[in-house]
């Protein structure tokens, strides 16, 4: 049993990080319309919105970007069950992308955290996670998935060896 636990810990201790160069790239945003409030740093992009920064791509019907004097704090992508928000980014030392979908995706740039709410799904390398909510710590390569409170949406983890 201890050997199995050690094997699992070793398997999951392989660190996979998003590309560090992405943070140094300019952010490009496209949408059908935009609302900008310079005083508060709140920006809302509506209608087939897309954010690009290096290999990072977020798409949704609505994307909200909160900025401060240092730059972007958070990006929130709002989709629906029928057309979820999407997040894609290259990973260091990996041929595959991090891919995520959910009704609501919040990317906390400063903390390096991605929060998925509502039919959350994440593919990292050859592994996939799904549940009602999902938290992905980019900097520490940790995933926390939770089932729905009513128990209708259980957590699922798939390892593709």
Describe the residue ranges of each PLM region.
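Mature-chain termini and adjacent capping regions
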Residues: 1-8, 13-161
């Amino acid at each position: 049993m201890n050997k199995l636990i050690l094997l699992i810990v070793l398997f999951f201790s392989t660190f996979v990080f998003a590309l560090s160069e992405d943070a140094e790239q300019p952010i490009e945003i496209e949408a059908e319309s935009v609302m900008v409030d310079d005083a508060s740093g709140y920006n809302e992009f509506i209608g087939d919105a897309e954010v690009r920064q290096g290999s990072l791509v977020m798409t949704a019907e609505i994307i909200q970007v909160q900025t401060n004097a240092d730059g972007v704090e958070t990006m929130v992508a709002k989709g629906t069950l029928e057309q979820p928000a999407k997040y894609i980014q290259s990973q260091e030392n990996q041929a595959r992308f991090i891919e995520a979908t959910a009704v609501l995706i919040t990317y906390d740039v400063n903390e390096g955290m991605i929060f998925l709410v509502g039919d959350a799904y994440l593919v990292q390398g050859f592994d996939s996670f799904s549940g009602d909510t999902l938290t992905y710590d980019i900097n520490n390569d940790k995933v926390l998935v939770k089932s729905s409170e009513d128990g209708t949406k259980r957590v699922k983890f798939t390892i593709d060896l």
